[in-house]
């Protein structure tokens, strides 16, 4: 009798240990995704276009009615030969809490995205997604395919920090409030581009866009590539666009569309910084107002093929023939000549544009009679 009781207790304990070893997500409603068996790493793609009700899993939850995907410590390490590792329908809001990671792990030829928004099922990345919250998303594509990308679709970043490895391919990009996008191209990225935008870019509030391109055989590859003929760049308030010194692409910010006049960049606040191996900024027209400022430098030219609109009574434009000159050392008088800036006939390799804050006395129309005592 005692032996039977011991065997019964052993069986109960064994069953309890088996249940404990099963990941909690295995019991989550609607969860049908593979884990690595030792942690809460999800190893299969998630397609939220297929969801028909609220669902949740390890580090994520989906509100079907509002199309809201909340990420809270999710870790997805998956390969896919379809749309992307995580696909969301048009109009989805993604809320970031904590630290989140999504990786496309296939290192072979894989023409995929890490995270994309889709409207038409047959067309990738034609949808819009809004990202908010105060967390972090690390999105990485490890594919060696030149068409492999990190993010896709029209992106509105209202908050949180997104660190994207692999080209961000977007129809339009908006960064507001405290949103931060750090984009890094890989050696496999098409033409070494970090951010490829077919529409416009808007950065305001305290929003920040940083893009680092890779060296490439393309004649004028860039960290930020813009291709639309009808859109513009807009930087206002405390927003910033930065292509830092580590950029290895030939151009920092480049418009490649067929509009011969280039693309306008309206900078009324914040700062634009652009380093490029050849040009800092190319075929982008700087329209300066308010408190906006620019630092741009290139191995050959600071700015090329530009039609600027800058009131020199309100802004100071200085230059240097030195590549990567420190901003405080850029003091030379520049002259605009056919789309380029020069200093004494030599090409300006660094140009700084900023509001004129020097003391000035401005006299308006005077009326009345001025008298002195005898």
Regions found by a protein language model. Give the residues of each.
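A composition-driven surface/loop motif
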Residues: 8-11, 18, 27-374
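Positively charged n-region of N-terminal signal peptides that target proteins for export
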Residues: 1-8
């Amino acid at each position: 009798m005692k032996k039977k009781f011991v065997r019964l207790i052993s069986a109960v304990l064994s069953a309890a240990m088996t249940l404990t070893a099963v990941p909690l997500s295995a019991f989550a409603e609607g969860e049908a995704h593979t884990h690595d068996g030792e942690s809460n790493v999800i190893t299969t793609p998630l397609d939220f276009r297929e969801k028909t009700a609220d669902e949740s899993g390890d580090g994520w939850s989906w509100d079907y009615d509002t199309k809201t995907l909340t990420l809270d410590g999710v870790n997805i390490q998956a390969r896919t030969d379809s749309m992307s590792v995580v696909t969301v329908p048009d109009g989805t809001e993604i809320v970031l809490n904590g630290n989140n990671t999504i990786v496309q792990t296939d290192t072979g030829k894989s023409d995929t995205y890490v995270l994309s928004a889709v409207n038409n099922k047959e067309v990738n990345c034609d949808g819009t997604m809004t990202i908010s919250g105060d967390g972090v998303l690390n999105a990485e594509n490890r594919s060696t395919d030149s068409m492999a990308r990190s993010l896709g679709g029209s992106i509105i970043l209202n908050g949180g920090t997104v660190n994207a490895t692999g080209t961000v391919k977007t129809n339009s990009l908006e960064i507001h409030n405290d949103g931060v996008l750090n984009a890094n191209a890989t050696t496999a990225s098409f033409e070494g581009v970090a951010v490829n935008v077919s529409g416009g870019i808007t950065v305001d509030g305290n929003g920040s866009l940083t893009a680092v391109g890779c060296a490439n055989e393309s004649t004028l590859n860039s960290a930020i590539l813009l291709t639309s003929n009808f859109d513009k760049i807009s930087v206002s308030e405390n927003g910033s666009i930065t292509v830092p010194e580590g950029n290895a692409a030939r151009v920092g910010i480049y418009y490649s569309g067929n509009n011969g006049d280039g693309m306008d960049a309206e900078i009324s606040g914040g700062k634009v910084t652009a380093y490029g191996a050849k040009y800092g900024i190319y075929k982008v027209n700087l329209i300066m107002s308010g408190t906006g400022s620019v630092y741009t430098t290139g191995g050959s030219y600071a700015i090329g093929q530009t039609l600027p609109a800058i009131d020199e009574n309100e802004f100071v434009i200085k230059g240097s023939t030195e590549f990567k000159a420190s901003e405080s050392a850029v003091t030379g008088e520049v002259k605009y000549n056919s789309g380029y800036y020069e200093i004494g006939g030599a090409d300006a390799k660094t140009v700084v544009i900023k509001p004129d804050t020097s003391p000035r006395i401005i006299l308006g129309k005077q009326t009345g009679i001025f008298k002195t005592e005898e």
